[in-house]
Amino acid sequence: MGEIEALARRPFAAAWSRQACADEAERTDSIFLVADDGAVRGYVLARVFEGESQLLDLAVVEDGRGVGRTLWSALAQAARGRGCRKITLEVSEKNSRAQHFYRRAVAKVVGRRPKFYNDGSDAILMDFPLA
């Protein structure tokens, strides 16, 4: 959990503590997946609710290695397996890398929450349909 906690403290992260990660992993309505090749390379955390999966966090140690795509695909498969029709998420308007990643994954912008984050930036709301 220590490696995951460190990843959760990167810029734009929700700053999950070790205990929060452990608690979330124990929930029956959560999907918590870790990319691990002897060392943690990334993780994805989502919650399932009424046919939807809400992405809570997706983090990778290094960009451009395919770990994020692998985790996203695994999340989609796990969410489908739990009967979800879509993955919903929010991303900071300032986090262009994440926005690009989600758009490449075919997530669509469906709304905006003004001044959602502590720094006053808006949250961009996106949906990813699960066929």
Model-assigned labels for residue ranges:
Residues 61-63, 90-94:
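Residue-level recognition of the GNAT/N-acetyltransferase active site
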